[in-house]
Amino acid sequence: MSTDQPNGEPRRYKIDPDPAWDLYDEEDGVLSVELSWVPDPLAGRPPELVASPELVTALSAEGLTGYTTGAARGYYNEYTPAAEEGAAVPELVRLIVGEDPAADFSFVRSQGLTVSERALALLQARCQNLTVRPAG
């Protein structure tokens, strides 16, 4: 990976995380998601994202910027294959991404979810279902 684009700005990447749910609701600041399967450490349909507590700890330990966290909970409906197989519902943390294009994480509707090279390296090491494209 190259650190800079031809214009000298740091290279950014557009990512699409694991789309692990179709239904969600927010009540009293808690994002509730009906999981379709056991999600990747980063999952969602931007701008609504959830992460595993382990991923959030890693993001913080690396000093990555551009996000805050909030409450989230996942659940399976009775027809979800994961529920039928007896999979436990994972603990989730809401990942709220800001709009600062200079931060490691950024979400702007016209551009989608973009990340820095540092953030991408960490996500690629931990996530299996992550689509990556050059931003811009």
Tell what function each PLM region has.
Residues M1-G136:
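Acidic (Asp/Glu-rich) sequence patches and key acidic residues
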